[in-house]
Amino acid sequence: MKVRASVKRICNNCKIIKRHGVVRVICKEPRHKQRQG
């Protein structure tokens, strides 16, 4: 899980979703998981 100021899609499987006001990237590649911090 990477915590960064600006979350971006890394590959085509990445999806940007908003959960409880937190922007997240979910992907089948675990290294692409991100959260806005």
Swiss-Prot record:
Keyword field: Ribonucleoprotein, Ribosomal protein
GO cellular component: cytoplasm; ribonucleoprotein complex; ribosome
Single biological process term from Gene Ontology: translation
GO MF terms held by the record: structural constituent of ribosome
Membrane-crossing segments per the record: none
Superkingdom, natural source: Bacteria
UniProt xrefs under InterPro entries: Ribosomal_bL36, Ribosomal_bL36_sp
Keyword Transport: no
Disulfide bonds: none
Family of the protein in this entry: Belongs to the bacterial ribosomal protein bL36 family.
Protein name as annotated: Large ribosomal subunit protein bL36
